[in-house]
Amino acid sequence: MMVIVFYTGTHYNIVMHQFWEECGHIVSPVSRFTHYIISENTCRLVHFNVKGMITSMKIAAVIAEYNPFHNGHLYQLQNIREELGADRILVIMSGNFMQRGIPAIVDKYLRTRMALENGADVVLELPVYYSLGSAEYFAQGAVSLLDKLGVIDYLHFGSECGNLQSLQEIASILSSESDTYVTYLKEYQKKGESFASARYYALMQELSSEKAVLTKEPNNTLAIEYIKALMMRQSSIQPVTLKRQGNGYNALSLNNELASASAIRNFMQDKQADYVRLADQVPSSVYSSLMDNQEYLYVDDFSSILYYKLISSFHAGHDLSDIYDMTESLSDIFRKHLTEYTSFQQFCLDCKTRNVTFTRIARSLMHILLDMHQETANQLKENDYTFYAHLLGFNDKGRDVLKAIKGNSSIPVFTRLPEMLKKLDGAALTSLQADIYASQLYYGMQGQKYHHTPINEFRLKYNPC
């Protein structure tokens, strides 16, 4: 492993001598500027101040949705501080639309504040093409963004199994795409199995059933995709997993203080719900934020605009073939059931089949709603996924992280949309425009539902805490 040293002060010889005295390592310059490499057993980011005093910073990252932030998320951030010993925590967070194909229950800036008040130091936005992507695309986009920042030591994530070695073994098979695996994957897909089921049966040919079955759990699946993305990039970021506590990812019960985000959203959507029950499920600051800002959005709030989008597309002879992650068979299903349309959620249930899940349908409908195109997704992948980092918020500790990023990131970090619209072009600009459009639609629906002018994100700078 390596230690990367950044020195921007004066008296280089004196400072480097002091470093050698304190750390016992010979320093060899790798450029004529400020970067030096020192051999050691762990990867650390080391900074010198102008007086030559050494300060070190271990930075961990989390990829999250926080929809909303709850006790399980708090447990993870506390574990990162206490068990991993991280000095700073950076979060890559989905914006206003989630991987399940639903809108965020509260907007990205309020969720950023929740995170910063409960252990995060910096929050960056995951572009919408990844936040609304499959598990693989979601992970590839998020890991690409983290890797390009150039300062992250660890990627910390939850999993049902909590066994990093088993997850890495599966990720290795998936990333290498062995002939055996690929052959069986295609064979089971031809038999009508969903991708997830086909992958499970294909992995059974190379792994024990005890390990292959791990892919059937949602957090394990994302964990495997994170590890696979790190492997494919040959990233120096080290994966760390934490066994999920409390209710399962899809559980809808509030009978546990570590209830899932799904259970909390389901409870909040009930108009007869006693919100006092939420106080045991989320940190006190989050509870206060949710009670003070009751402008919640749900997928059915987008029912009318989705119906208009579908009927206008089909009426114009558009077969939806250019839509992101769309297939001809899925388009036919949508056309077939359109005459039965009553709401977004019910339409997903009507269109669900044995090998097409509710979530896959919901994501595809959001792709239609947000004019997300397969050509753009392909361009993003071909150009290594990410081109910018949108800063949603930070606290005082986060300033150190931002300074480190500024000196090491291969992509720009920005707080104001107008400045980036002027600087980006090509696929990068298309990606940012998709983010802007998604937020404008979200805030537009929020404004209509709660009878106020939509939030204008172009006037926002950042959300310090």
Question: Model-derived features: where do they sit?
Answer:
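Methionine residue identity
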Residues: 1-2, 16, 53
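A glycine-rich helix N-cap at a beta->alpha junction
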Residues: 117-127
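N-terminal catalytic cores of NTP/NDP-binding nucleotidyl/phosphoryl-transfer enzymes
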Residues: 54-111
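Active-site cores that bind ATP or allylic diphosphates and position pyrophosphate for catalysis
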Residues: 126-465
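Compositionally biased, intrinsically disordered low-complexity segments enriched in Pro/Arg/Gln/His
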Residues: 29-32
